[in-house]
């Protein structure tokens, strides 16, 4: 087997390539997170970190009363730095990051990230999906939403692994009567334009990892808040939001709505909509189906859902898409880099009788042998191997496609 190898010079810190098929113009320079001048004049490192308050939220939201929110614990602070870097690259200042523990407070403050202390008793380690600690985060998140809209703000709230790559508020303004707009776990887009998903796509699970709320959603959020707070360690915020939002809803009723893709939710008291899954992308739609790339439109957000290997897997996916922010030293290892051009025969990718389980295994094994050889060569040369994109015959999934 012939392995074509290129000994790569160290990448420069500004060597940000466009993700997948995008042009360089579509990708923002997000290196500013390492610039100490990006304090915004707030003196954050010198002052005590405040709690989430109306004074803080309204001041940061500014005259448009629009606020971007996320939150993190100590082991996801690097996600927060990446989240903030992309927002700063957009020229936005109307954002805050909540810290759920004292270590996160210290690191965010030292990193000059506008933040507030959530003062929770949540575990400082991983929050495994479905665990009691994972569910216990829900009331804190809902409280941020509830307070924000009670104070008269429009709010986009995201998980810390849901990156904000374009200013979302001009998009939300297209639907002025919507009380909430939510992302979705739907895996097939129902429209070919950049509008909301139509009513064929609103029955899949709403994903609350990236959501928009207006004060008109207060009736829904109040009920959501009340129900979760009754049993906060056992009731899942996303599951209950889906149930409550669909309580006595009328998805087929469109009278009086600014757009026929909106719908009446929660006892016909609140208007909702599903954001386009190509532009407000979950992990499968962005990294696997690549809907945004095929449309040729840069997404508003990428949320690393449907990924394996917990935080490490999420970091890898975001690095692969060239949207993860590393310190400049990451691109300049002492011994240099090693890249190679993988050999992926067309006959293995498109077997004459179609892909089979054995065909998929043969395709993967062919590529793993090359990776093994490249790893051995990199170790012998003292270089870091840049892993190639691996072509798969089948998609690994635990969910129904």
Predicted feature locations:
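Active-site-proximal specificity loops/subdomain of glycosyltransferases
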Residues: 103-151
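N-terminal signal-anchor transmembrane helix specifying type II single-pass membrane topology
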Residues: 1-19
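Short, acidic, metal-binding catalytic loop of nucleotide-sugar glycosyltransferases
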Residues: 86-94
